[in-house]
Amino acid sequence: MVNNPPLLASVDLGSNSFRLIVGRVEETEAGSQIYQVDALREPVRLAAGLSRDKMLDRASQERGWDALRRFGERLRDFHPDHVRAVATNTLRVAKNAGEFLNEAEAALGFPIEVIAGREEARLIYAGAAHSVPASSGKRLVVDIGGGSTEFIIGSHYTPIKMESLYIGCVSHSRAFFPAGNVDEYTMRQAELAASREIQIISADYKKTGWEQAIGSSGTARALAELVEANGFNDAGITHGISRAGLERLKRALIKAENVNRLKLIALKPDRIPVLAGGLSIMLAVFNELDVEYVDTTDGALRLGVLYDLLGRSQHQDMRTITVEGFMRRYGVDRAQAGRIGELAVRFYDQLDEPDDERRKENRMFLGWAAALHEIGLSISHSAYHKHSAYIASNADMPGFSRTDQARVAALVLGHAGKLGKLAQTRDVEWPLLFCLRLAALLCRRRADVGLPEIEVSQANGGYEVRLPNAWVQNNPLTDYSLSQEAAEWEKIRTPYRVVYTDD
């Protein structure tokens, strides 16, 4: 990847809107900065097509695919390393998300990562922190999306607390205002439902404290525009959202009796169906977290994705930082992890891979899998690889998408033991697993012993390992282990040939 590419792009497949931004990277005295040069927004309302049994209907999928085809045209000339597309809550919970994503990736022309709630929160904070003036105090960032709401407390560019709750403007509007009707009782019930969710985190968050509250993304900005344009804020407050401003907006909405009859300055048509749900959640935020005023920012998830992408281009990949933290936390034997990782990569480099970018990515995943393959020893030596895989699959891992975590976890799970357990797993990359298992087998002594020249290759749908016969004769345990390894691969109908050479 070229350092500081002139243009980067991020795509946010939100539960309410799909958004694309293109940013230009510029070097300043304070470091690399990203300036937005283009943006597209499509009010897809994907969450509105989610049924009670968590299935996306065809109409919402079609809206999403159409939007992504238009985005794809704008991104047609971009290098894959300069684009990152992420999907959030609706595609986290939809049972047929895979069906949607297959067509979505074809429409966009780039991979789409489904990210976990806390990873979404981390990226939201990164975007917000880069778009507001520097401050020495702590900030609370609240991002009300279509299907979830993220709460982050951070200082400077570092998040301290991150949570994602399953309340959003689309899902809340569908649950409490399906026909757009609003009255005192229904609004109160919607507020209480949101409050019950926020109460889970409110005590801990208030104990941590903050000096500034910021609302990011569409709901906060839409509410701010409405209270500002219609003079709902108290005198002297020219921008942002005040408690009094929200209450006056609520009164106007209840008086109108239906969101479609509400006549206010700055009320955009695509915001009407989700206004009541978003307002009730923001009211609950103010009440449960004792907030009196919220400033707003345009910087949110998509800007955070751009800065994360920029970090990767400058070799500051958050995933590497996360793996390093896990190694410290779980007391990983660094020498052994390094040994296995280096050997696995050496084997992988002998295999055919025509795509240089794919090769570079796979080398990173092999290194991460080697670094994490023994973290399960912190639980038990027995079946440690299963414990390691469970942690890698389920822990919050900043920088990793769900797909990333699944890839690493599959390698970690498969590096030892029977291969049959992976037969039904879609996330297994068998050539990488071949390299990792062989490296782990040869590094069993956990010491820097000299290994002979070992050649590996793929042939006839399987693998071949070639090593000197003289060396094998002096290492009977390795000889036995290789025969067992070959038998294990044969069980899943993958040829595995060990050739002892005379050189």
Regions found by a protein language model. Give the residues of each.
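Short beta-strand scaffold segments in enzyme catalytic cores
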Residues: 18-23, 149-153, 223-224
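N-terminal glycine-rich anion-binding loops that anchor highly charged ligand groups
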Residues: 32-48
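C-terminal amphipathic alpha-helical interaction region
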Residues: 497-503
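N-terminal basic/disordered segments at the start of proteins
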Residues: 2-34
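Helical "lid/coupling" subdomains associated with nucleotide-phosphate turnover
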Residues: 2-8, 45, 49-78, 90-96, ...
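Cationic, histidine-enriched alpha-helical/coil surfaces that engage anionic ligands
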Residues: 82
